[in-house]
Curated annotation (Swiss-Prot):
Principal subcellular localization: membrane
Its job: Malate transporter.
Gene label: ALMT7
Family indicated by similarity: Belongs to the aromatic acid exporter (TC 2.A.85) family.
Ranges annotated as spanning the membrane: 28-48, 52-72, 78-98, 104-124, 130-150, 166-186
Compositionally biased region (Basic and acidic residues): 467-485
InterPro entries the record matches: ALMT
Membrane topology, from the record: Multi-pass membrane protein
Record keywords, A-Z: Ion channel, Ion transport, Membrane, Transmembrane, Transmembrane helix, Transport
One Pfam family from the record: ALMT
Cellular compartment(s): Membrane
Organism encoding this protein: Arabidopsis thaliana
Any one GO biological process: malate transport
Protein name: Aluminum-activated malate transporter 7
Domain of life: Eukaryota
Length: 506
């Protein structure tokens, strides 16, 4: 009984992980039920006979999870069957001309030669990537038709029936796959790359995102205000970490480890890109979409993830510099990490919306500017009294962070190439981290941490509203008080000038 419960739990977990798997299972059952009518419906059985089993076999081996995989396998199988069928008929005709004695010998030679050559060609990397299944079916079909033809007088009729049933089975798979709850490999690849961007940005930015939105004097301040708790490189390496309890430490460690899934995503990306090439245009993805460029972006993201993995090990190294040095280096390091994370986050959002990542350029430039500030600080001789072992650990970590910034710039360039090739639309300016407002409903937010857990938010709008009081530089000051109770976050906002409004967010 316990085994049954375990199987049920596993089934629920698999279905919850991706509900499309349940739909795919029903689709396979539907196609098999349709092609089985070759046996149940007498006129169809009279036409094809036992060769109807080839339609069933085609459905079983061709129907895959995504449209691209199904199309690829289906077209490969049909093409291989047609080609092998034609060659099989030709081989049988040539062998029959040699008489009863020489016919089996020649057929054996033909089967040996084509099987040996086809198997060798399967080792070619490009062929193996896209046409391995086609060659496998070619070997099987040629051998079966050649051998069957030796005992079957009407070899052409036999070949026609088998090819027809294979085509019918393949078409059934393709039609159901495309028109009944389709799963597009291209969309999955697109989402995977965007998700990888987010995982890297999560490490660099931190693991706490608080969304605050309010209405101050009937002015929509923001769609989303992101107040980052900077658990990034600067905070983690250059500040004294307080004891938050074992549960909090474990949770944060688990959140930061999300980037590790990017390290092993290469095979998944390549298979999705290969399947996506077979798919017709769908949604925002036109035919011959530049899927190869997605692989280039994914490769650079993976290189960045390896740098982050190495950096993470140095963050937890035993040899740490003194608190004074940490405080002096904290600000530029924090800016380098934060701006890189912002650029990654903006690129993720741009890719999801298929817009050009124009706002990421500013964050990359800010990160490079912080890198120059750090270089000037190091040239000032701040590390003269640091112990050699501590110095090695510190400089290695800094070098890795600089590499991350350089890779972020390369990723951005590669994403620009993808945006141009895929004809992404121009972005409507509403970046999450904009420094200057572009419209009435969008404002820039600068937070200044005060005593305890109070934060003063300086909010700047376009200056077209006279109902709200401003300070001398045209900005509004809002005092934010934040409390944490259990798992909820309560935020109270009050305008310093007029005390107009408050908001609570969970």
């Amino acid at each position: 009984m316990e085994k049954v419960r375990e199987i049920v739990r596993e089934g629920r977990r698999v279905a919850k992980e991706d509900p499309r798997r349940v739909v795919h299972s029903f689709k396979v059952g539907l196609v098999l039920a349709l092609v089985s009518s070759f046996y149940y419906y007498q006129p169809l059985y009279d036409s094809f006979g036992v060769n109807a089993m080839w339609a069933v076999m085609t459905v079983v081996v061709v129907f895959e999870f995504s449209v691209g995989a199904t199309l690829g396998k289906g077209l490969n199988r049909v093409a291989a069957t047609l080609f092998a069928g034609g060659l099989g008929i030709g081989a049988h005709h040539l062998a029959s001309m040699s008489g009863p004695t020489g016919e089996p010998i020649l057929l054996a030679v033909f089967v040996f030669v084509q099987a040996a050559l086809s198997t060798f060609v399967r080792f070619f990397p490009r062929v193996k990537a896209r046409y391995d299944y086609s060659l496998l079916i070619f070997i099987l079909t040629f051998a079966l038709i050649s051998v069957s033809g030796f005992r079957e007088e009407q070899v052409v009729k036999l070949t026609h029936k088998r090819i027809s049933t294979v085509i019918i089975g393949g078409l059934s798979c393709v039609i159901i796959s495309i028109f009944v709850c389709p799963v597009w490999a291209g969309q999955d690849l697109h989402s995977l790359i965007a998700s990888n961007f987010e995982k890297l940005s999560f490490f660099l930015l931190g693991n706490s995102f608080h969304y605050v939105s309010s209405d101050l004097n009937s002015i929509t301040l923001l769609r989303k205000i992101k107040s980052w708790r900077l658990a990034d490189f600067g905070d983690k390496y250059c500040e004294v970490v307080e004891n938050d309890g074992a549960k909090e430490v474990d949770k944060r460690k688990k959140d930061f480890d999300n980037y590790k899934s990017v390290l092993n995503s290469k095979s998944n990306e390549e298979s999705l890109a290969n399947f996506a090439k077979w798919e017709p245009g769908h949604g925002q993805f036109r035919f011959r979409h530049p899927w190869k460029q997605y692989l280039a972006v994914g490769e650079l993201i993976r290189q960045c993830a390896y740098r982050i993995h190495a950096l993470n090990s140095y963050l937890n190294a035993d040899n740490q510099v003194s608190v004074d040095i940490k405080k002096k280096l904290g600000e530029p390091l924090r800016r380098m990490s934060l701006e890189s994370g912002k650029a990654m986050k903006e690129m993720s959002i741009s890719l999801k919306k298929m817009t050009k990542p124009s706002s990421s350029d500013l964050h990359v430039q800010n990160a490079k500017s912080a890198c120059k500030s750090l270089t000037n600080l190091l040239n000032s001789g701040i590390l003269k009294e640091v112990e050699p072992l501590e110095l090695v650990s510190l400089l290695t970590a800094i070098s890795l962070l600089i590499d991350i910034i350089n890779l972020t710039e390369k990723i951005l360039e590669s994403l620009h190439e993808l945006a141009t090739a895929a004809k992404f639309k121009n972005k409507i300016e509403h970046p999450l981290f904009s420094e200057k407002p572009k419209a009435k409903s969008f404002v820039s937010v600068r937070s200044i941490k005060c005593h305890d857990d109070h934060v003063v938010i300086i909010i700047e709008d376009d200056g077209n509203n006279d109902d709200t009081s401003k300070n001398d530089n045209g900005s509004k000051e809002v005092s934010i008080h934040e409390k944490h109770e259990d798992d909820d976050t309560h935020v109270d906002a009050r305008c310093v000038s007029c005390g107009h409004t408050s908001v609570c967010v969970k």
